[in-house]
Amino acid sequence: IDGNEAVAQVVYQINEVIAIYPITPSSPMAEWADAWASEGKPNIWGTVPTVVQMQSEGGVAGAVHGALQTGSLTTTFTASQGLLLMIPNMYKIAGELTPTVFHIAARSLAAQALSIFGDHSDVMATRGTGFAMLCAASVQEAHDFALISTRTTLESRIPFLHFFDGFRTSHEINKIELLTTENLQTFIPNELVIAHRSRAFTPDNSFTRGTGQNPDVYFQGEEGTVIYYIACQASLKSMDEFAQMTGRQYQLFEYHGDSTAERVIVLMGSGCETVHETVDYLNTLGEKVGVIKVRLYHPFDSQRFIAALPPTTRSIAVLDRTKEPGASGEPLYLDVVAALYEAGEQLPKVVGGRYGLSSKEFTPGMVKAVFDNLAATIPKNHFTIGINDDVSHTSLDYDPDFNI
């Protein structure tokens, strides 16, 4: 089973309205949902989800927003420019504290050129919308997080982007442990669904939403959502409940490596798998290295991130699968730097780098080069890995023949 089908199998069964407009590499998720609806396949409540194809991703976002206002459990799948067209509605959905999950096969954006391949450029463009962001690193995680994100959005009322790497994960065929219908029914309590229904616009439950506000109250309204984002981090305790149900334990920030590691790489997405295996190999050679896999990117829980770091950490490399021209650093790097600075403790050296844009290969040799850079007296910051940058000279040298 590939990543797209693994996600679609869960999503179809726990939603009532699925608005679609196909875009590579997320299209198979929409195709699966459409096919199952045509066959009359029911969800866990015994009804056949309504799958509707709109005229564009902008139309999809409007349809999702509207369906959510009726109390329907609603979702969509998209990527890249399609996700960008949804941003205006995403601000409204998040601002109105409306539970939903958008499932994203993360893909490059068309900038200096178009590319259909995977990186995190699209999801990072939505950081200001107010959506929480949960990242899966494998087909199994994508399958599981499709359920965990839905449970958490219903509990917290914070909408979610559940994303995984386009092609590298969305089209990877792997053997996984599938969630059963009983698992889904157990993990989505009826009281959460009823609570979502109770906020629907109906003649019997009339109230005002989406008003125009003036300076006397708008600021207060914006700040009033803070408690929901704090609660959202706590809501992911459902990961522990998921572990009891399936035996698969996930953490918001998962550390893997030597317990006394001095050099640590921080990243999210499919690259975590490569770093994980390379860390194991390097530690057998006597190195003291580790990796932190970021699952919940937004809202970023600084305290849990600090707690996940080994106390022996002396240097950190934060790897982003995106580029933000003109910024002082890439998104994950900036969040990590802020978390460490605000902790007020002895700060390890932190450098940031870019890798894997447009599905550029990310190999064990590249991981070793990043760790070697961290061992330098003055590590290179804002580096690239995986290319030969003979223009701005940001790239790290690596051994293409290194293998594990």
Swiss-Prot record:
EC identifiers of the protein: 1.2.7.-
Domain of life, source organism: Bacteria
Iron-sulfur is among the record's keywords: yes
Gene: nifJ
Protein name: Pyruvate-flavodoxin oxidoreductase
GO biological-process terms attached to the record: nitrogen fixation; response to oxidative stress
Pfam families recorded: PFOR_II (PF17147), POR_N (PF01855)
Keywords per UniProt: 4Fe-4S, Electron transport, Iron, Iron-sulfur, Metal-binding, Nitrogen fixation, Oxidoreductase, Repeat, Transport
